[in-house]
A protein has these predicted regions:
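Extracellular/virion structural assembly segments
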Residues: 1-209
Length: 209
């Protein structure tokens, strides 16, 4: 089985796979870690520096870079026609990116064609993706709230869960009328304690570093 990268256009929803659709073979995959945004201030009369990186409550991250190298055996004329097809779909476009090595997650980023080349037999293309810091779980997480104390586990990324409830509900002393409430409940990394006097459904998108 050939390892593939799947690209899904954010704008159109059209999906293309590196081998099945483009006919190129993945030979190298680099997934960079997002760099923490470290902010320090030197204060006169103080040893070291003052670290304000978590001034807003939690550490933030820069974008991360994904880089993929693909190769194929083509005649030069056929190869440049293929490069044109790949570039038309990917270059400068924002994509959901699914890697073979992490089947439960996807990345979101803008793709660029870094380079392409060919010799008498071998064509090569390098695609870089400037991606958001977190990778996202493919499946949306659902949690059924019950009367009493609920423990909702969340991954690394802080999220705001949507709440759907058929009747009025109070969660951690806040009252929500019947209906759908978008981005209603803040969930941080780990176990979140929610005290409810009714029932409802939480849905949220989990993300990991």
């Amino acid at each position: 089985m050939i390892n593939e990268i799947k690209f899904m256009s954010i704008n159109s929803g059209v999906t293309k796979r590196s081998f099945s659709d483009f006919g190129v073979i993945l030979t190298s995959q680099e997934i960079g870690a997002p760099k923490p945004k470290i902010y320090t201030v030197n204060v006169e009369g103080m040893d070291g520096s003052l670290d304000l990186s978590e001034f807003f409550g939690e550490i933030k991250y820069e974008n991360r870079t994904l880089k993929f190298t693909f190769e194929t055996i083509e005649k030069i004329s056929d190869w440049y026609a293929k490069v044109c097809i790949i570039s038309s779909f990917l270059h400068g476009q924002k994509m959901k990116i699914y890697t073979w090595s992490e089947p439960d997650f996807y990345y979101v980023g803008r793709c660029t064609i870094d380079e392409y080349s060919s010799n008498a037999k071998l064509g090569k293309i390098v695609i870089s993706c400037d991606c958001e810091a977190y990778k996202y779980k493919q499946n949306i997480t659902t949690f059924n709230l019950t009367n009493g104390t609920n423990t909702v586990n969340n991954s690394r990324m802080t999220v705001f869960a949507d709440l759907m409830n058929e009747s009025e509900i109070k969660i951690n002393n806040r009252v929500y009328g019947a209906g759908t409430h978008l981005r209603a409940i803040k969930l941080t990394c780990g176990a979140n304690k929610l005290i409810s006097d009714g029932t409802g459904i939480l849905t949220f998108q989990e993300g990991e570093i």
